[in-house]
Amino acid sequence: MNFLRAPRRFGRLAALSAVSLSAACVSAQSLPEAPAKACQSVEHRQFDFWVGHWEVFGPAGKKVGENRIELIADGCALLEQWTGHGGVTGKSLNIYDAVDRRWHQTWVDNGGTLLMLVGRLVDRSMVMSLTGPSPSDPKVAVQQRITWTPAADGSVRQLWELSSDAGTTWTVLFDGRYVRAR
């Protein structure tokens, strides 16, 4: 029976009630149960020490920029938003992959730099690395390693290094101390 063209004996109110009841039954039957929250494992929380609004200082104590790291996607990823005093801006997306059991970071900046790092927590430090072409000579393969280490005072040290001899020696590209912004 077409309820919208129901005989007058049912009346329009009865027809609309029947349509509403039918829609509610279909809707109630098709609603999936709320899924368990993803990304709640201990491993997913390993990089949370980096979350916050930071002022970043170089080794000599001079402020070199600001960084905001926030949890996104219901806590499944970290979004980094860097603003350097030299005009460099960049963002990274960081996520723990439960399949390969490693952390992944994809960094892009306004200079066209793309870094795709992979790593894990080593002791208390997050260590990510990549092997790829040298920024100064694309014909030469280099290793890059970035280590984030939380300190007892709540600050975080970020050390970015490069090796062109398969990890025998390392050159520091960036050494920053993150202090929570006030």
Residues of each region from the PLM?
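Bacterial N-terminal signal peptides that target proteins for export
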Residues: N2-S17
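Hydrophobic small-molecule pocket/channel-lining residues, especially in calycin-type beta-barrels
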Residues: C25-R182
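Hydrophobic core
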Residues: A18-V26
